[in-house]
Curated annotation (Swiss-Prot):
It catalyses: (2S,6S)-2,6-diaminopimelate = meso-2,6-diaminopimelate. The keyword Isomerase applies. This is Diaminopimelate epimerase. Pfam families: DAP_epimerase. GO terms for biological process: lysine biosynthetic process via diaminopimelate. GO terms for cellular component: cytosol. The record marks H169, E218 as: Could be important to modulate the pK values of the two catalytic cysteine residues. The gene is dapF. It comes from Xanthomonas euvesicatoria pv. vesicatoria (strain 85-10) (Xanthomonas campestris pv. vesicatoria). The lineage of its organism: Bacteria, Pseudomonadati, Pseudomonadota, Gammaproteobacteria, Lysobacterales.
Length: 284
């Protein structure tokens, strides 16, 4: 049980995947999902528990799935995809006893995901088939997919790749990721009319064909220590350009992820850690 209605206490688990941190709530006992105000309050790092996103464990929605999960950003908005969150939900379900065996399926707000337990605290998650057509991202003003787009933004031209991994991503290749204008350009692209649903913006540096470095400015959150779907997006955009191999290590400020994509209509597979931090109760 996650909540005690009489006392207002909310039970939770704090987790992270490569530094992308989450508050996990089990709603399968009938506890209602958080509204935008409660989600933002819970995610507040000064007055709440503090996290990038809230993950809610729910009853499965598809045949064969062991459970489903919802995603709430730190500003209270709902999200449809979260790769690091998928791994943390998988690990939570294994510890809870809901998920049995080495392979199982979980439902995100976007789709069902196949999960595989690896060594230690590592999990692999099938993240779906990347969508490059502008209408599917969505990216307005362009009729057909291309390797690189250009937009005039406040007097400068920003060049980027674009893809949907169940959520929209723009990928900006840079020479040095440490010096990338993550917050400034990230916020400008998110506010640009070309992205009607806003966009997650990744800044990626190719170290060598098997290794990239990445920083991500996320919708509804800002820059995070890691973004799983952002790592997938950066990898597949670079793979499409022939800049990296089909199996690539992605170094983020909070840790390491590995992204594999055979290409065409195959699913992207992301692997990385899912770490328990602590269990607690929040007096709301």
């Amino acid at each position: 049980m996650s909540a005690d209605g009489r006392s207002g206490r909310l039970r939770f688990t704090k987790m992270h995947g490569a530094g992308n941190d989450f508050v996990v709530l089990d709603l399968r006992d009938g506890t209602p999902p958080p509204d935008a105000a409660l989600a933002a309050q819970l995610a507040d790092r000064h007055f709440g528990v503090g996290c990038d996103q809230i993950l809610t464990i729910e009853a499965p929605r598809s045949e064969g799935a062991v459970a489903a999960y919802g995603i709430w950003n730190s500003d209270g908005s709902a999200a449809r995809q979260c790769g690091n969150g998928a791994r943390c939900v998988a690990a939570w379900l294994v510890r809870d006893g809901t998920a049995q065996g080495e392979r199982f399926i979980i439902d995100s707000p976007m789709s069902a995901h196949a999960v595989e337990r690896l060594d230690g605290d590592r999990y692999a998650v099938a993240m779906g088939v990347p969508q490059f057509e502008p209408a599917q991202i969505p990216l307005a003003g362009f009729a057909h997919a291309r390797d690189e787009y250009a937009l005039p933004v406040h007097g400068e031209t920003v060049r980027f790749g674009a893809v949907s991994m169940g959520n929209p991503h723009a990928v900006v290749e840079v020479g040095r990721v440490d010096a990338a204008p993550v917050e400034r350009v990230g916020a400008l692209l998110q506010q640009n009319a070309a992205f009607p649903d806003s966009v997650n913006v990744g800044f990626v540096q190719v170290v060598d064909p098997a290794h990239v470095r990445l920083r991500v400015f996320e919708r509804g959150v800002g820059e995070t220590l890691a973004c799983g779907s952002g790592a997938c997006a950066a990898a597949v955009v670079l793979m499409q350009r022939g800049r990296v191999e089909r199996d690539v290590q992605v170094s983020l400020p909070g840790g390491e992820l590995r992204i594999r994509w055979p290409g065409d209509q195959e699913q992207v597979v992301m692997s990385g850690p899912a770490v328990f931090v602590f269990d607690g109760e929040w007096n709301r």
